[in-house]
Amino acid sequence: MKIKLVSYSKDGERIVAIAAKMSRSRKGWDYHEKEMTDDEIETWIRDSITHGYWSVLEHSVYTFSIEGISRVASHQLVRHRIASYTQMSHRFAKPVDKYYKPITPPSIEKRGKEVVDKAYQDAYNYFYQLLEKGVPEEDARYVLPNGVNTNIVVTMNARELYNFFGLRLCSRAQWEIRAIAWKMLDEVKRVHPRLFKYAGPNCIIHENFIRENPITLDDIDNTVFISQRCIEGVTREGIPKCVKNARSILVSEDGVVMGK
């Protein structure tokens, strides 16, 4: 898989901070835009996130190109409804040889790869047999597998990304959507480290609601959690290990699953 942040709100961190401050001030945009310091930006972002003041994060927007994932993963992705999606259509983009690279889960790589390889090849052959019989592409594609590779353009604002990360960075998320989420997090932290400093699975988000000083993913090894257990039932003693296990997923551009 290949995940790339292709566009984003360049001044997103500053915009979020100014919006947060304006909600508590009688002064307008020009004043706060001129007077806002870098330290204030970090403070307003942190306080907005730890107090659940999520609406200000909606002002910063991000567009990703996500390539070489399965239809299984893309179907999970589009369940996050506060977003915009444009996906490759197998009605118009037929799976010709060099572009037909269905995704094989790591559990199958070790147990039944030959079975899946045959199923994928059979589906490919059946697709073209149907086309030869005059079946239109929009109907012939019904025989293509859930694992067929696809590309999708995704646009989310920072608030929805926090919600997406909370659910999909978690070890309970399926491996492929989890790998997508961790790569997307890496991309947004590269351009907006302050805005996504406190992003993480829901165990991190919910913990920060009750802590005086919020924690980050980098603090996980040195943190004693206040929460007795996360919403998935993992005890506070087990949360650090659970997060590290979730973070260990890494998938190369050619689909090889590796440790991180």
UniProtKB/Swiss-Prot annotation:
EC identifiers of the protein: 2.1.1.148
Domain of life of the native organism: Archaea
GO molecular function: flavin adenine dinucleotide binding; NADPH binding; thymidylate synthase (FAD) activity; thymidylate synthase activity
Catalyzed chemical reaction(s): dUMP + (6R)-5,10-methylene-5,6,7,8-tetrahydrofolate + NADPH + H(+) = dTMP + (6S)-5,6,7,8-tetrahydrofolate + NADP(+)
Pathway note: Pyrimidine metabolism; dTTP biosynthesis
Coiled coil spans: none
Cofactor requirements of the protein: FAD
Binding site for dUMP: Q76, L77, V78, R79, Q87, M88, S89, H90, R91, R141, R168
InterPro entries per UniProt: Thymidylate_synthase_ThyX (IPR003669), Thymidylate_synthase_ThyX_sf (IPR036098)
Positions contributing to FAD binding: S55, R79, H80, R81, Q87, N157, A158, R159, N163
Ranges spanned by the short sequence motif ThyX motif, renumbered to the chain: 79-89
Job of this protein: Catalyzes the reductive methylation of 2'-deoxyuridine-5'-monophosphate (dUMP) to 2'-deoxythymidine-5'-monophosphate (dTMP) while utilizing 5,10-methylenetetrahydrofolate (mTHF) as the methyl donor, and NADPH and FADH(2) as the reductant.
Subunit structure: Homotetramer.
HAMAP family: ThyX
NCBIfam families assigned: thyX
Name of the protein described by the UniProt record: Flavin-dependent thymidylate synthase
Annotated organism of origin: Sulfolobus acidocaldarius (strain ATCC 33909 / DSM 639 / JCM 8929 / NBRC 15157 / NCIMB 11770)
